[in-house]
């Protein structure tokens, strides 16, 4: 009897418990039915729901993906056919380089720095004029600001005293500005002195990303033994360059001569063509992928008396290509087609060396594949009018009519050359051909038709790509050559990658959200900006 009574008590208690459980379950169901689905879904359900994937808390331990911001730089370009003349110590390039309006990059292209004689074209390349141009450019860019632009005394003193902008202290003996123009300058030695320490330039700074490996595995690999990680030591393949081009091996401890504000990034000569790229010192750590190529289009369509030099590089995450060219000459009908052919062959045959096997390396191998292309030079396009017709329009300052007959404008408008390139509006007089040391065009002083040339805008600067705005397009007035120099300043956008170190994904708090079965109360989920 006692056992039966105990069983009845147990049955009674189980019945009460089951009734209580049913009522609690009913209450919880009622609450959950009126609650946002974001609260009552299980963790597994939340993971599988693409609509609320942001609540996957396992992603909070990883940093945000790198973002890209846009910055604007000033880029100065200049082109000058110097007619085979070698500069002397009286030539001041400060006005030519517009140094008072300091740019971030300076790209200086010259044509005919040596006479285009058979000896220079076929035998030995004369490097002395190129060395002198480098010395003059460096002196203009790195001259102390307190010196007057027009002070000849200051100009002479800067080359003879012991405290010039590029020679101070122990570096004086090797500083380029101490070079006497009566000595025989050595381009290799000068370019080594002007160039930045090679340890500051990365051949390739693109990250190596293995998409077949998960994020956790990549993170573990990053913090593994650094001696086993070769991603930061990628060696270029087939990376051979001219001795004048890239940085010679300089000890990492070597100081910059005189702490120059601008350093030579690259330079190259091909017979009379000479191109150099200079950068503000602060930008040097962000320059990479530096490569060079040249294409000869002169005698037999191959030699270097005509053609181009091209320099490719990346600044931050943006690729640049600078092209300096000297195209086929002549003002006879049909000569413009030869110039068109030169441009086509340059675009076809310019091929920059491949740097690395890294598939994520953004180092274009062709000119048109770059983000920003800046093309300068003596393009040699003429005005499709007679000398007499051109002279009348010049005397009337009717440049609009002249520019309508400009061969480059006509050929570009017809889509036969420089497809996709742009040129700023021209507000200056034709740059070729002038009499020696004169402001008069050749032909005004003589009756000989052989020496007469129809004035033309031979010297031009064009560009291709997004994020480029031309701020100025002018010519210089130096009488040094039968060409007037042409300069342009651009505002150029570059992509800068931000790594977001120490930051996490925005949108949700890192607090775990759990639904406890015994407490069916809606939880508040926090957000922050």
Swiss-Prot record:
Phenotype of the disrupted gene, per the record: Affected root hair morphogenesis.
Residue segments, region Catalytic 2: 451-466
Chain segments annotated as transmembrane: none
One MF term in the entry's GO annotations: inositol-polyphosphate 5-phosphatase activity
Record keywords: Hydrolase
Gene3D superfamilies per the UniProt record, alphabetical: Endonuclease/exonuclease/phosphatase (3.60.10.10)
SMART domains named in the record: IPPc
InterPro entries, alphabetized: Endo/exonu/phosph_ase_sf, IP5P_plant, IPPc
Keyword Ribosomal protein in record: no
Catalytic 1 as annotated region, ranges: 371-386
GO biological process: cell tip growth; phosphatidylinositol dephosphorylation; root epidermal cell differentiation; root hair cell differentiation; root hair initiation
Record has Lipid biosynthesis as a keyword: no
EC number: 3.1.3.-
PANTHER family in the record: TYPE I INOSITOL POLYPHOSPHATE 5-PHOSPHATASE 5, TYPE IV INOSITOL POLYPHOSPHATE 5-PHOSPHATASE 9
Function: May be involved in the regulation of root hairs development. Required for restricting both the size of the root-hair initiation site and the width of the root hairs during the transition to tip growth, but is not required for normal subsequent tip growth.
Family, as annotated: Belongs to the inositol polyphosphate 5-phosphatase family.
Name of the protein: Type I inositol polyphosphate 5-phosphatase 5
Species: Arabidopsis thaliana
Gene: IP5P5
């Amino acid at each position: 009897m006692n056992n039966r009574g105990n069983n009845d008590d147990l049955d009674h208690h189980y019945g009460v418990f089951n009734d209580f459980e049913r009522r609690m379950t009913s209450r919880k169901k009622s609450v959950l039915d009126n609650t946002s689905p974001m609260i009552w879904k299980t963790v597994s359900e939340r993971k599988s729901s693409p609509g609320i994937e942001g609540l996957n808390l396992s992603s909070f331990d990883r940093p945000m993906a790198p973002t890209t911001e846009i910055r604007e730089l000033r880029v100065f370009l200049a082109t000058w056919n110097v007619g085979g003349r070698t500069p002397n110590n009286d030539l001041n390039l400060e006005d030519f380089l517009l140094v008072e309006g300091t740019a971030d990059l300076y790209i200086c292209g010259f044509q005919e720095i040596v006479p285009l004689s058979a000896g220079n074209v076929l035998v030995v390349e004369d490097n002395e004029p190129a060395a002198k141009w480098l010395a003059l450019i460096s002196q203009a860019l790195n001259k102390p600001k307190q010196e007057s632009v027009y002070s000849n005394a200051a100009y002479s003193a800067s080359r003879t005293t012991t405290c010039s902008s590029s020679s101070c202290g122990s570096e004086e003996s090797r500083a380029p500005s101490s070079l006497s123009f009566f000595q025989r300058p050595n381009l290799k030695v000068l370019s080594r002195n002007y160039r930045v320490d090679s340890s500051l330039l990365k051949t390739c700074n693109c990250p190596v990303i293995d998409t077949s490996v998960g994020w956790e595995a990549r993170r573990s690999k990053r913090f593994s033994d650094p001696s086993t990680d070769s991603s930061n030591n990628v060696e270029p393949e087939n990376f051979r360059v001219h001795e004048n081009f890239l940085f010679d091996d300089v000890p990492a401890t070597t100081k910059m001569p005189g702490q120059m504000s601008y350093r030579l990034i690259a330079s190259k000569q091909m017979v009379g063509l000479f191109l150099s790229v200079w950068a503000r010192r602060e930008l040097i750590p962000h320059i990479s992928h530096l490569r060079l190529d040249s294409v000869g289009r002169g005698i037999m369509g191959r030699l270097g008396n005509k053609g181009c030099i091209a320099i490719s590089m990346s600044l931050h995450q943006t690729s640049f290509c600078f092209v300096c060219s000297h195209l086929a000459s002549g003002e006879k009908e049909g000569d413009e087609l030869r110039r068109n052919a030169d441009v086509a062959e340059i675009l076809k045959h310019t091929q920059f060396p491949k740097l690395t096997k890294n598939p994520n390396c953004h180092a274009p191998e062709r000119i048109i594949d770059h983000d920003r292309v800046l093309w300068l030079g003596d393009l040699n396009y003429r005005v499709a009018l007679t000398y007499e017709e051109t002279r009348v329009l010049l005397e009337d300052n009717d440049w609009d009519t002249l520019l309508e007959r400009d061969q480059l404008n006509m050929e570009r408008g017809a889509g036969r050359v420089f497809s996709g390139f742009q040129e700023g509006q021209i507000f200056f007089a034709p740059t070729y051909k002038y009499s020696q040391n004169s402001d008069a065009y050749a032909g005004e002083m003589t009756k000989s038709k052989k020496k007469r040339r129809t004035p033309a805008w031979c010297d031009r600067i064009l560009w291709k790509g997004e994020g480029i705005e031309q701020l100025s397009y002018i010519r210089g007035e130096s009488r040094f050559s039968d060409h007037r120099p042409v300069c342009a300043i651009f505002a150029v956008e570059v992509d800068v990658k931000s790594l977001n170190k120490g930051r996490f994904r925005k949108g949700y708090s890192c607090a775990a959200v759990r639904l406890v079965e015994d407490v069916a109360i809606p939880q508040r989920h926090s957000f922050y900006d």
